[in-house]
From Swiss-Prot:
Protein S19 forms a complex with S13 that binds strongly to the 16S ribosomal RNA. SUPFAM superfamilies: Ribosomal protein S19. Residues 9-19 have a biased composition (Basic and acidic residues). Pfam families: Ribosomal_S19 (PF00203). PANTHER family: RIBOSOMAL PROTEIN S19P FAMILY MEMBER, SMALL RIBOSOMAL SUBUNIT PROTEIN US19M. GO terms for biological process: ribosomal small subunit assembly; translation. The gene is rpsS. Gene3D superfamilies: 30s Ribosomal Protein S19, Chain A (3.30.860.10). GO terms for molecular function: rRNA binding; structural constituent of ribosome. The keyword Transmembrane helix does not apply. Residues 1-32 are annotated as: Disordered. Belongs to the universal ribosomal protein uS19 family. This is Small ribosomal subunit protein uS19.
Length: 91
């Protein structure tokens, strides 16, 4: 169930402050955050945000197609190495 329109999108305050200061100074440096739960708003477009995936920060370049999604959707937490081949089939 999506969040109520009445409440508006959730953005951590510290991330919102960093985005506002990056826009004011026209900074191109990535914004480092651990807030995977924050919703991407139109203010984020064009910025690079480094989202923590539990081990490292993954750089995410925000475009207009990402608006409305969460930051955590673009920094995957699990790596799939593939299924191990059956040893009996090799013989």
């Amino acid at each position: 169930m999506p969040r109520s329109i009445k409440k508006g999108p959730f953005i951590d305050e510290h991330l919102d402050r960093k985005v506002q200061s990056a826009q004011a100074s026209n900074s191109r440096r990535p914004i480092k955050t651990w807030s995977r739960r924050s919703t991407i708003t139109p203010d984020f477009i064009g910025l690079t945000i480094s989202v923590h995936n539990g081990r490292q920060h993954i750089p995410v370049v925000v475009n207009e197609n990402m608006v409305g999604h969460k930051l955590g959707e673009f920094a995957l937490t699990r790596t799939f190495k593939g299924h191990v081949a059956d040893k009996k089939a090799k013989r």
